UniProtKB/Swiss-Prot annotation:
InterPro entries: Leu-rich_rpt (IPR001611), LRR-containing (IPR052394), LRR_dom_sf (IPR032675). Coiled coil: none annotated. This is Leucine-rich repeat-containing protein 74A. It comes from Rattus norvegicus. Residues 1-29 are annotated as: Disordered. Residues 1-10 have a biased composition (Acidic residues). LRR repeats lie at residues 119-140, 147-167, 176-197, 204-225, 232-253, 260-281, 288-309, 316-336.
Length: 479
């Protein structure tokens, strides 16, 4: 599952959404329930004195002239050189302007143009030094543009004022924007407070990336309070921040009652074993999380054991990544045995790929996978053997499938579709792994299934059978 690739939920009508949120109609009520820290007074930039306002006074001009002409006029207005790439691609759904050195005035010209644009759905503006003025132009544009759905303004050094402007916009809930990437913007504790105050009542944003910022434990407390109230977020990336035990516990406490978040990435932080304990307790209660990444968080065998307690009772988690934690064979055992003891476990992917295991572990894992055939456990290798010799695929699974379909005079597509009850060309990874291992026509083990999935998997957690046509197998059976 790729970072932030959870699809947005179907949008409700405005009346339906407001009705659903009626019990939380005031900020006072929200913050009283969450017991959040005192709010930061928000001083909006004075619009009259701001050089970032979208200044074309004749609003009809936004819609009466072509996009190219409007952009050229906007560039002339703000005094910047037009970007040829933008002109060539302004009718495409994805506009990638990462690393273009646009600056705040270049962003302003683009924002003026996008006010009336109906084709760009995804706007990439990473690393453009857009500053406070640039982000203000973008937020003003989003007040008018109801087509743009995804925005990336990572690595733009937005800081506190940028966070304030974004928070003001998020509180209004009046755009189609559902995916927002704010990675690497030097956001600290006060920024977290502003953003969390806005997100506590925002139901539009489904995917939020706040990785590579400077959040520590106090920010973790704000985020935990927000998660207890938020009814929109499905994916949250907080990797590469500075959360330690206090922040980890606060985050996990917020997740206990959260009913929408499916994907959480907190890798490269400092949860430690106490944070792992909080996560384990959360997994006992949470009925929504599907994907959790706690890679490189200083979690030892003790922490793995504590997470295992949650896995024994959890009925929704599918992916757990524990890569680069100091977990050994003992911790690996506790994890797979917890899954074995849970007949309702939906675990599909356990990543302990820095752990060397024993032959006895592999035998136990075989037994676990017999109960849960959708499960794949990725480990480094077998103790005493080189990594290359640890797993032998024997025969390439592609070749096995080709031989079977040739002998039975059926197409490969027909074989794959027979595995899918819906008869479609796509299938969830876990369901496919279970089906390909359990089918009796072709002897495919879990290692071969893993290789097959690598070739057919898309970034959205689905395998696409049409990808088989592009795979070539040599006479030796190698891809």
């Amino acid at each position: 599952m790729d970072d932030d690739d959870i699809e947005p939920l179907e949008y409700e009508t405005k009346d339906e959404t407001e009705a659903a949120l009626a019990p939380q109609s005031s900020e006072d009520t929200l913050y009283c329930e969450a017991e959040a820290a005192p709010s930061v007074e928000k001083e909006k930039p004075t619009r009259e004195d701001s050089e970032t306002d979208l200044e074309i006074e004749d609003t009809e001009k936004f819609f009466s002239i072509g996009q190219k002409e409007l952009y050229l006029e906007a560039c002339k207005l703000v005094g910047v050189v037009p970007v040829s790439y933008f002109i060539r691609n302004m009718e495409e759904s994805c506009m990638n302007l990462n690393h273009h050195g646009l600056g705040p005035m270049g962003i302003k010209a683009i924002a003026i143009t996008l006010v009336s644009n109906t084709t760009v759905l995804k706007l990439e503006l990473e690393d453009n030094s857009i500053q406070e003025e640039g982000i203000l132009s973008l937020m003003e544009m989003l007040h008018e543009n109801y087509y743009l759905q995804e925005l990336n303004v990572s690595d733009n050094n937005l800081g506190l004022e940028g966070a304030r402007i974004i928070s003001d916009f998020l509180q209004e809930n009046n755009s189609s924007l559902w995916k927002l990437k704010l990675s690497g913007n030097k956001f600290k504790e006060e920024c977290a407070l502003l953003l969390c105050q806005a997100l506590s009542s925002n139901y539009r944003i489904r995917s939020l990336n706040l990785s590579h910022n400077e959040f520590s434990d106090t920010a973790g407390e704000y985020l935990g309070q927000m998660l207890a109230l938020n009814v929109g977020l499905q994916s949250l990336n907080l990797s590469w921040n500075h959360f330690n035990v206090r922040g980890a516990v606060a985050l996990c406490n917020g997740l206990r009652t959260n009913v929408t978040l499916k994907k959480l990435d907190v890798s490269m932080n400092g949860f430690g074993n106490d944070g792992a304990l909080a996560l384990g307790d959360t997994l006992k209660l949470n009925s929504c999380l599907v994907y959790v990444d706690v890679s490189r968080n200083g979690i030892t065998n003790e922490g793995a054991s504590r997470i295992s307690k949650g896995l024994e009772n959890n009925e929704c988690l599918q992916v757990l990544k524990l890569f680069l934690n100091p977990v050994s064979l003992e911790g690996a055992y506790s994890l797979i045995l917890a899954i074995k003891r849970n007949p309702k476990s939906r675990m599909e992917d356990l990543d302990i790929s820095n752990v060397l295991v024993s032959e006895q572990f592999v035998k136990v894992l075989d037994g676990v996978c017999a109960i849960h055939p959708q499960l794949d456990v990725v480990y480094k290798g077998l103790q005493g053997l080189s990594t290359k010799k640890t797993v032998s695929l024997e025969t390439n699974p592609i070749k096995l499938i080709q031989n079977y379909t040739d002998q039975n005079k059926i197409s490969v597509v027909e074989f794959f579709k027979s595995l899918n009850p819906s008869g479609l060309m796509t299938m969830p990874v876990g369901d496919f792994r279970k089906a390909i291992i359990q089918q009796t026509n072709i002897p495919i083990n879990r290692y071969q299934a893993r290789e097959l999935i690598k070739k057919l998997e898309e970034k959205n957690g689905m395998v696409n059978f049409s990808g088989f046509k592009s795979l070539k197998v040599t006479a030796a059976g190698q891809l």
